[in-house]
Amino acid sequence: HLINFAINYCDFIMSTNEGDAVATCSGAYLAGKKPVVLMQNSGLGNAVSPLTSLNDTFKIPILGFVSHRGQPGTKDEPQHELMGAITTELLELMNINWEYLSKDNVIASKQLIMANEIITKGKSFFFVISKNTFGDHALISNVKTRNVFINRNEILNQILRHKADDVLFFGTTGKTGREMFEIDDMENNFYMVGSMGCISSLALGLSLNSRKKSIIIDGDGSLLMRMGNLATIGFYKPKNILHIVLDNNSHDSTGGQFTVSNDINFVEIAKNCGYDNCIELEDKESVDQALTNWVKNTTLTFLYIRISKGSKKNLGRPSVSPTDVSKRFKDFANKKND
């Protein structure tokens, strides 16, 4: 994997979202460097604003590598279908030169020379990466790790035990929703796919318009990508939201690359954003007790739990389509309690 190689051997900056990555590369260019931005095409939408209003406006060229999940003619997950169909067209609409990177090393070397010439002339260039263009590359750990022994599956089991007719569960993008599905698939579960970082915004919109209780199960990477929503939630203070963050200091579903969460005090941030009750928990028992207390006396609450990296082997994916997940979830959310 190209990102793993870059982390191992290059001056790599782990941005929290693709738009920030583009802006950071642009700053490096202004410092006289030749920056490269790496992203999955599902995040290309996040990069549109700086690519069109920063790079194009200020004539700051960057080199980009973007994957092609959902490439037409290939089988992929449903959340990649639309972006896969429009990835290259979107680059063209932004007046960005692009090519598919060849799997042949000789041809690819010539492509890189060509791209450098275009960038030298002040124009950005993106390589679109088809599946299997790069081989596997092991990630060398280069950040300090934490000794954490509780895993996500254990915590999710504790959380989902608190199911009720007036409780909705929102599972963030990646392994969280997949594990929730395997533990207990319910019509009041929303399994987010794609839209990384948007789970808390989704829950906010529902919670402000429903009396049902919303339990958000978030991750460190997801929260960091859209951390501004903590302030929005804190401002509107919906009492029926319980926001749980499971922090494994990694992007687990994309290969375990580190996040920048290691030295962040999310509990204090949530408190300063206006959450009424903010607690760090360290074991399953305290998680169970905290949920029991919240269900009895709902108030805007933030729970933070450090967990270990990794998930169960051969983890499956929800067999219920996103469309059906949305429909049954809406039906449940609008069902009147007896």
Which residue stretches match the model-derived regions?
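Thiamine diphosphate
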Residues: H1-E92, I96-A203, L208-K212, V260, ...
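DG-centered beta-turn motif at the end of beta-strands
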Residues: S42, K213-L223, G228-L230
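A short alpha/beta connector and helix-capping loop motif
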Residues: T52, R226-D247
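Active-site regions of oxyanion-processing enzymes, predominantly non-cytosolic
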Residues: K123-V128, T299-I305
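Active-site flanking residues adjacent to catalytic metal/cofactor-binding acidic residues
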Residues: I129, I217-D220, L246, I305
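Residue-level marker for buried hydrophobic side chains located in beta-strands
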Residues: F169, S214-I217, I244
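A contiguous pocket-lining binding segment that forms or flanks enzyme active sites
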Residues: I241-D276, E280
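A short, acidic, amphipathic alpha-helical segment used as a generic capping/interface helix at domain edges
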Residues: D283-K296
